[in-house]
Amino acid sequence: IGLELDVLPVNNFRMYEKLFPHSEFVDISPMIRKLRSVKSAYEIDLMRKAAELNDSMFAYARQILRPGMVEMEFAGLLEAFLRKREHQGLVRVRSFNNEVFYGHIMAGVNLAVPSCSVGPTGGPGPNASMPQGAGTRVIRENEPVQIDYVGSYKGYIVDQARTFFIGQAGEEFLNVHDLALKIQQAIMEKGKAG
């Protein structure tokens, strides 16, 4: 019997051992990961549509972002924009019955706040029981506002982030941004289609 032993809880595995005591169990996790790592043309098209949804959300963000908005207010407007366009909300990740929230918005010093998130972004979140993403901080002029959202279309996802400024970005920020673009280009040169 093939099981995904990299994500299946031990209690579940023990239950299957009791239900099928004369069976051999095989870890098919590597096979599934390899199969899912290369996308068909159909799947790539769905991922493109998810990216287009995110692109339209980023364009909308550019139109509505204003100093004085609270991070959670801004997040709510963007989340409503996405949901009205069939974003599924929670997104599935490779884990056992695990879904994650689909985005983080952080501004200014909140960009440096660590959180419970396993991803690269954090943020204080709305409260201590959900310490990640948008919080109650007011967005100010001349500070970075980062939007890191997962676009989703029919179960296929793309994770994209953009940083906005209301006003002017400082020289140090622009230098780091240039470095990030160089790293992105190097990664793109190493990648392959599918």
Label each residue range with its predicted role.
Residues 1-194:
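Active-site neighborhoods and metal-handling regions in enzymes and metal-associated proteins
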